[in-house]
Regions:
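C-terminal PAP-associated
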Residues: 1-174
């Protein structure tokens, strides 16, 4: 096909949620998308209240999420969430609200990292990632995860790449 075809989603459920007082019911204004090695598509959508997961199987043609979508329950006003996926349902979520969430471990930072190995059903406790503007990527068929970020600790203007060679397990990023 010459054009992108629509896929089933949660638009109807979102409209119902809005009418019944269900807040945003998942539809935000920006987000990020990733595909694991089994062609499961993960979309992370953001709103002022929280982030929402949408999951599609069969190469993106079948909507798998609950009747509306799955709430992240991280931190409000997460601006520019980033997501990467690899293997069989391993998801990496890099959030940004300008401040470290209180539940994060390790150093303080503008960004925080969450890890899931069950397709986004559960996530690890977050780990603060020190530094400036960041984004995340992973190998679909390999074990490496990368976070590229500006060095906000100095005025050098350098970019730092943090690397995990173990699917981002534990803090994993050095």
């Amino acid at each position: 096909a010459d054009q992108f075809e629509p896929t089933p989603g949660n638009l109807l459920n979102s409209a119902v949620g809005s009418v019944t007082g269900g807040a945003s019911a998942c539809l935000g204004d920006e987000g990020d998308i990733a595909v694991d090695e089994n062609d499961m598509v993960y979309y992370l959508d953001t709103t002022l209240e929280d982030n929402w997961w949408h999951k599609f199987s069969d190469g993106g043609t079948v909507y798998e999420s609950p009747s509306t979508c799955q709430r992240m329950n991280t931190m409000a006003a997460d601006d520019r969430p980033w997501v990467a996926a690899q293997g069989d349902g391993i998801i990496h979520y890099l959030g940004n609200s300008g401040a470290s969430p209180p539940e994060c471990t390790g150093d303080v930072g503008r960004y925080w990292y969450y890890h899931s190995e069950d397709g986004g059903l559960t996530f690890s406790q977050c780990y603060a990632v020190p530094g400036g503007w960041s984004t995340i990527a992973s190998q679909r068929h390999g074990s490496y995860v990368y976070i590229a970020q500006e060095d906000a600790d100095t005025n050098s203007g350098e970019v730092v790449v943090r690397i995990s060679d173990d699917y981002g397990r534990g803090t994993g990023l050095t």
